Amino acid sequence: MAEPNFAPGLEGVAATQSSISNIDGAAGLLSYRGFAIADLAAHSSFEEVALLLLDGVLPGAADLERFDHGLRAHRQVKYNVREIMKFMPVTGHPMDMLHCAVASLGMFYPQQELSDAERGNTLHLDAMAMRIIARMPTIVAMWEQMRFGNDPISPRPDLSHAANFLYMLSGREPDPAHTKILDSCLILHAEHTINASTFSVLVTGSTLTNPYHVIGGAIGTLAGPLHGGANQKVVEMLEEISSVQQVGAYLDRKMANKEKIWGFGHRIYKTRDPRAVILKGMMEDMASHGNLRHSSLFEIAIEVERQATERLGAQGIHANVDFYSGVLYHEMGIKADLFTPIFAMARSAGWLAHWREQLADNRIFRPTQVYTGEQDRRYVPVAQRT
């Protein structure tokens, strides 16, 4: 029997066929369902992009209104889930809370697997996806209140997806400029082809388990430091630098020790990350109009971006989406440990689109392995072992 090919991390292995998103890493291009990400960020909304990812076409007015109404109507989280959250340690990371809370939603799902009829019912799958997308921001915002001893703030059906989340975080009317920033960030983080968390969606979904298990697994995967969390690391890095005057020495030390500079470079993009280009322009525009608080950390970030680009730009290493989203979230007053849960809120749309695509032509994942262990060993009773 021929030895199977071994590709560590499945790098370069096409594990699926997909029509959801596409990346041209050499040209620095990203598209959702064939639409350039720059056009979607400029003209669309997260609600519309989520439905585009799920259904494959730009929705008409009636379909978009139906989906948007459904999102607003399903923001409330069952009281039992809130009770579960009460017993979680407030010192835990919000991603651990989100993983647990989303998994608990599956307790209210009547079946542990999808029937043939359900898998073929587009409206049914849309409804399940809509409920998850609607409730994840509520869970994150509830936790932000509960971990500081406050009662959760009820969602408002008169607000958009992004605006409602900002309202539930603070209890204040959301700033329109901040709402636009968050909406754009949600669009830019909504989908990015097959990465670790999306691959976990395919593997878990291929078993025909319910979508709460599928998304719970993806959240757990995203929580790993090699996948999600980079924008939180960006803010921690900027706080460590502490002043504009220290930027050069910090970068020199990191480069001399061949250590990672958070928020720079990308495994796929060989030029500028198109999402980063959009967010940088937005950051500059918002700052010039006084819509960001312009903290000392913001000034450090601008200098890090300038000096790091001078040192690394010729190698094709530029600031990525995590660098700018981390800075923008910080300037909006959002705590750093909420950055990855917000990433998960956005990516839920892409995850669920891939879940649906997997169900449409399902085959359970069963890769092989290259065995490297010993053979034909003889069992020795414990009394005779030396």
Swiss-Prot record:
Keyword annotations: Transferase, Tricarboxylic acid cycle
Reactions catalysed: oxaloacetate + acetyl-CoA + H2O = citrate + CoA + H(+)
GO biological process, any: tricarboxylic acid cycle
Annotated active site: H266, D322
Source organism, top-level taxon: Bacteria
Pathway membership, UniProt: Carbohydrate metabolism; tricarboxylic acid cycle; isocitrate from oxaloacetate: step 1/2
Enzyme type, top EC level: transferase
Gene Ontology terms for molecular function: citrate (Si)-synthase activity
GO-annotated cellular components: cytosol
EC numbers for this chain: 2.3.3.16
Family: Belongs to the citrate synthase family.
Note: Citrate synthase is found in nearly all cells capable of oxidative metabolism.
Full protein name: Citrate synthase
Highest classification ranks of the organism: Bacteria, Pseudomonadati, Pseudomonadota, Acidithiobacillia, Acidithiobacillales
Gene name, Swiss-Prot/TrEMBL: gltA
